[in-house]
Amino acid sequence: MDDLRFRRVHVAGAGGLLGTAVADELEAAGHELLHATAPVDAVVHCPAPEPPGRLTHRRLAAHRRGEEARARALAQDALVSNARLVHVGTAFAWGDHGSSWIDEGTPQRPAPLGAGDADVARHLLALRKERGLDVVFVALGLVYGPGGLFERALLDPRSRVVGWGGNYLSCVQVDDAARAVAAALQRGTAGTTYLAVDDEPMTQRAVADAAADAAGRPRPGTASLGLAGARVGFPLARSLAASQRVRNARAKAELGWAPRFPTVRDGVWTALPR
């Protein structure tokens, strides 16, 4: 076990799927988890899940405003306490790059679910330049695990592949995501972004089929972007239809992290209803 550089940690968003996993991972590693009002060595900002139900542009905008306000407040807290801030974002900030590979240096053209995160990252980097904020960024692939998007999709017989399904998705199992966040807290370089995804981007069709096969359910059909957007909301539909082949080389090399579930096929069972 590493000597803990940042022992006292506040995890913002610890009640969600990802935040719970991050809190569990840090506690198991020996960190002391504290409330926001206590003196801390580090703050981890886990994003709140998108609101349930149909995700309209208006609902997403309201959610994004809340997340941006929380990120700004946590950054101020970190500056006052001279604490490290780990901002957990999403690979959707890079958007659709077709069949080309994406790494941290790839230009961002955010998908709808990543637009707010790109704005927050710019603000936090400005605070680093102007006031010395010790901030590290972890951008996660599509996170799956118990109680998450995959489980909800499996329980909904109306779930469909958006479009023809040939776009790439880069995913990460929730416990692997939590381990990446913990590694970034301990070993990440300030001002640096780490993309944390599994080892094999799969097409949306392959991901959907792997989930259905693991659950013993029929493989889903397809729906046009228009039909999918009308049912689940266009921001979500457009994001799921974006093609993202994301590399994890920097996280492996600099953080010493590697996914225990290298593909969705290996880990999808963890998202099945129990």
Please provide the spans of the model-predicted regions.
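N-terminal Rossmann NAD(P)H-binding glycine-rich loop of SDR-like oxidoreductase domains
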Residues: 3-29
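Conserved beta-loop-beta element that borders a ligand/cofactor-binding pocket
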Residues: 90, 121-146
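Conserved Rossmann-fold NAD(P)-dependent oxidoreductase catalytic core, especially the SDR/UDP-sugar
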Residues: 71-112
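Conserved C-terminal active-site "lid" loop/helix of NAD(P)H-dependent oxidoreductases
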Residues: 205-209, 229-258
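Amphipathic terminal alpha-helices
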Residues: 262-274
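Mid/C-terminal beta-alpha module of Rossmann-like enzyme folds, strongest
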Residues: 17, 21, 180-235
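Substrate-positioning beta->alpha
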Residues: 116, 143, 148-153, 162-185, ...
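NAD(P)H-binding glycine-rich loop region in Rossmannoid oxidoreductase-like domains
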Residues: 34-73, 77
